[in-house]
């Protein structure tokens, strides 16, 4: 489970960096858990170079290395390239890790909502291998649903969108557009995640006021700024000119972490140094409770909501997952024929943060077609300029949602 959480964390930073290349100074928000889950369900059927590329991009390769080094097992001289074959026993820990996380997230609870689901929509005339259906159910609880892509693609699209909308409490609507589902579509693999929780310590609505949010040194926009004074775990990174705060949700099973640069320099958002230095190892180290100090804080945090919808096809190709999108794609783990390729990877996400807490949801469809300083005084933590944030499942240390807030949405 820890290895899969680390894989998702490394993928989070890689994906953010790639999205940042074309979205500088813009808001970015996505669910690395949702994207990784949908792609892992696809990876379950991948073979050869298709599987190797997917494993590299999703950081499954490191997880397998970690597994093989922790289990003292003599090498039988198998060719190295076989190591990440999804049928190979050593890839099993990847899929088992996803199963454990899925079970942990979907555990019944009264205090907050966290759930995630997978589903396979398949053209009713297209035969999937029983082994694939069995494994996808075993590891991903993914039930196959037969639909009529061939002659009723629009009806199939609506059915998928309705399922996603239901799974996400209507926060993700119209995940798939008419252009996404065609008569040539054979398979759509979908993951949905929904999260809603109240803060452990809530903001008082009467203390919320209109204040400026600085977009740059000279530009600002008004926002509804929430305020409270309370004790929170804080990390101060003087050398890197930023500080981080952990805002726990009720029961402390999940937290939002906010990474805030000390200030904005001319012509920047203030996030540049942090983004240059950002790695998953550092993020894990910073968010370690042993690194953080319980501090009395005057916390100012804007109310905000973000929504995004992206086709990740080009992004994933640029990250190195190329073969899966071509006629050379090999998904013979799900069919006898070598006639399937991924045509799109659609991801839609939503987050809303207010005085009570946070609501966040996301869905991903893979469309397959033919040092800390101790502070004794009150620390001012005023989030009035661009920042990074992520929502983490604390026990497994899995990043469920990750984002950058640069600009308040009208």
UniProtKB/Swiss-Prot annotation:
Impact after mutating residue 214 to A: Reduced interaction with DNA
Outcome following mutation: residue 338 to A: Reduced interaction with DNA
UniProt effect for mutating residue 99 to Q: Reduced interaction with DNA
Outcome recorded upon mutating residue 107 to Q: Reduced interaction with DNA
InterPro entries membership: Serpin_dom, Serpin_fam, Serpin_sf, Serpin_sf_1, Serpin_sf_2
Main localisation: nucleus
Tissue/organ expression: Detected in all major blood cell types. Highly expressed in granulocytes (at protein level).
Keyword field: Chromatin regulator, Chromosome, DNA condensation, DNA-binding, Nucleus, Protease inhibitor
Keyword Hydrolase: no
Family to which this protein belongs: Belongs to the serpin family. Ov-serpin subfamily.
Role this protein plays: DNA-binding protein that promotes DNA condensation into transcriptionally inactive heterochromatin in terminally differentiated avian blood cells. Promotes tight packing of nucleosomes into spherical clusters by binding to linker DNA and subsequent oligomerization. Acts as a cysteine protease inhibitor towards CTSL (cathepsin L1) and CTSV (cathepsin L2), but does not inhibit serine proteases.
Protein name: Heterochromatin-associated protein MENT
Organism for this UniProt entry: Gallus gallus (Chicken)
């Amino acid at each position: 489970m820890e290895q899969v959480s680390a894989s998702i964390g490394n993928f989070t930073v890689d994906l953010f960096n790639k999205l940042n290349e074309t979205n500088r100074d813009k808001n970015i928000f996505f669910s690395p858990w949702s994207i990784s889950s949908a792609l892992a369900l696809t990876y379950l059927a991948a073979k050869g170079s298709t599987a190797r590329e997917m494993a590299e991009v999703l950081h499954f390769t490191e997880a397998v290395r970690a597994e093989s080094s922790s289990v003292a097992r003599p090498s039988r001289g198998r060719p190295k390239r076989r190591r990440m074959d999804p049928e190979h026993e050593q890839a099993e820990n990847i899929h088992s890790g996803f199963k454990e996380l899925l079970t942990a997230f979907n555990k019944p609870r009264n205090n907050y909502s966290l759930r995630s689901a997978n589903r396979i929509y398949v053209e009713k005339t297209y035969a999937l291998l029983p082994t694939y259906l069995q494994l996808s159910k075993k590891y991903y609880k993914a039930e196959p649903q037969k639909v009529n892509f061939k002659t009723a693609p629009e009806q199939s699209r609506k059915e998928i969108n309705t399922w996603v909308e239901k799974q996400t409490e209507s926060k993700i609507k119209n995940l798939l557009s008419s252009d996404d589902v065609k008569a040539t579509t054979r398979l759509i693999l979908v993951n949905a995640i929904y999260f809603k929780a109240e803060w452990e310590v809530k903001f008082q609505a009467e203390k919320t006021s209109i204040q400026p949010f600085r977009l740059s040194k000279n530009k600002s926009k008004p926002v509804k700024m929430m305020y409270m004074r309370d004790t929170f775990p804080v990390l101060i990174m003087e050398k890197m000119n930023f500080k981080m705060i952990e805002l726990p949700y009720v029961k402390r099973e999940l937290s939002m972490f906010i990474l805030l640069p000390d200030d904005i320099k001319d012509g920047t958002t203030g996030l540049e140094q942090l983004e240059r230095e950002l790695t998953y190892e550092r993020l894990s180290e910073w968010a370690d409770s042993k690194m953080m100090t319980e501090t009395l804080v005057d916390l100012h945090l804007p109310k905000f909501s973000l929504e995004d919808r992206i086709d990740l096809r080009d992004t994933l190709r640029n990250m190195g997952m190329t073969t899966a999108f071509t006629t050379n794609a090999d998904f013979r783990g799900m069919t006898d024929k070598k006639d399937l390729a991924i045509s799109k990877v659609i991801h839609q996400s939503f987050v809303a943060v207010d005085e009570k807490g946070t609501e966040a949801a996301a869905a991903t469809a893979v469309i397959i077609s033919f040092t800390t300083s101790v502070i004794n005084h009150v620390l001012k933590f005023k989030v009035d300029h661009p920042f990074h944030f992520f929502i983490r499942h604390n026990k497994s240390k899995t990043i469920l949602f990750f984002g950058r807030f640069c600009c308040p949405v009208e």
